[in-house]
Amino acid sequence: MSYWFEEPYQSLSELENLYTKHILDETERRFIVEEGSTSVGVVELLEINFIHRTCEVLIIIDPQYANNGYAKKAFKMAIDYAFLVLNMNKVYLYVDIKNEKAVHIYQSNNFEIEGTLKEHFYTRGEYRDCYVMGLLKRNWVNKLSLIHI
């Protein structure tokens, strides 16, 4: 997880507390990415704002399952959910500017770089810059959606 912005959790109780805190939070949706009965990752919609109709998306795939198409499919399904179920107008994300592979993937899904946040997060002993990337609903539906309406 070279480009993850947060420190790992230290214990199961820490994760249980996080789960309890967030299970009823209407501003978040989490989806487990599975291969059969094995969890291979998670995709999340965060900071869901029903007034401005915006939300943040993030995805994590276990490195041992990388390059198998899980991220691509889960990412597109999460975007479909945001636009077609939650009726969001915009989905945005933050990505380390050095994570060129991720930036390329997001751009291939019509996300545009909207700006750079200087020294926005601290990891591995240094401050890192990140891009804010966004996608408007009108640029997603009828172009890249897995769900055809």
Task: Indicate where each model-derived feature is located.
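Glycine-rich acetyl-CoA-binding "A-motif" of GNAT/NAT acetyltransferases
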Residues: 38-41, 101, 127
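Conserved GNAT acetyl-CoA-binding A-motif
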Residues: 84-94
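Acetyl-CoA-dependent GNAT
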Residues: 7-66, 136-140
